[in-house]
Amino acid sequence: MTIKSVSVKGIDVANEQPFVLFGGMNVLESRDLAMKIAEHYVEVTQKLGIPYVFKASFDKANRSSVNSYRGPGLDEGLKIFEEIKSTFNVPIITDVHESYQAQPVSEVVDVIQLPAFLARQTDLVVAMAKTGAVINVKKPQFLAAHEMKHIITKFGEAGNENIILCERGSCYGYNNLVVDMLAMDEMKNYAPVIFDATHALQKPGGRSDSADGRRAQAAQLARSGMAIGIAGLFIEAHPDPSAAKCDGPCALPLDKLEPYLAQMKALDDLVKGFTPLITD
């Protein structure tokens, strides 16, 4: 099965189209902070003419430490998403970790994300598929690009072909990730591909009880991914990354969002303006 494009509230997500930004914050820390971050993203993306989907998690169920902040939970999280959606008129993407969450989440958000560590969990895949929502599948750090076909097939067998694939890095020894650009390009043969340029900066477990990251290289890594010609970019930002409750070492400073996205848009426009070059 090959999926050429999916539509998110009228936004065309396809590898040949102008890139779509899936961006926001890692985890909902408070209603006020979420509103502030969403407002800034909306202002910047409207100014630059970039299609936009707001992202945040209501529960980080896979934290390194049992003592780490997880989020406000399903009920409170959905209330915040509803307010963001109605206030700013933007689509929403969030992740689910258990089958029972899929249906209530689908009634509020527009894209449901399948976490990388759970991407082979068939019961969760089926529950998500049955909602009919657009699904963003994070590629597990331990799978090859061609293995993503099996996950797409699971969704298809359950009646859902509205699939996006998301690259977020591959394990490279302990506490390290690398991004295989050739593998990301290969995934374009199966579905629209977006690049999680935030979590690909991670050093999982690099701080013993939490992940470390390489925020200083946020632009370099994202530019590398955009050069392939992909459907979208997935990023997280925070007004004060050092104080973020999850993945601060990977988060883009919120005040750098506009110049960062301006570079990505310029590169996306350039790459997609090239005449396709067949070298095989």
Swiss-Prot record:
Single Gene Ontology MF annotation: 3-deoxy-8-phosphooctulonate synthase activity
Stretches that traverse the bilayer: none
Recorded coiled-coil stretches: none
GO biological process: keto-3-deoxy-D-manno-octulosonic acid biosynthetic process
Pathway annotation from the record: Carbohydrate biosynthesis; 3-deoxy-D-manno-octulosonate biosynthesis; 3-deoxy-D-manno-octulosonate from D-ribulose 5-phosphate: step 2/3; Bacterial outer membrane biogenesis; lipopolysaccharide biosynthesis
Record-level GO cellular component terms: cytoplasm
Reaction(s) catalysed by this chain's protein: D-arabinose 5-phosphate + phosphoenolpyruvate + H2O = 3-deoxy-alpha-D-manno-2-octulosonate-8-phosphate + phosphate
Family: Belongs to the KdsA family.
HAMAP family referenced in this protein's UniProt entry, alphabetically: KDO8P_synth
Protein name: 2-dehydro-3-deoxyphosphooctonate aldolase
Originating organism: Colwellia psychrerythraea (strain 34H / ATCC BAA-681)
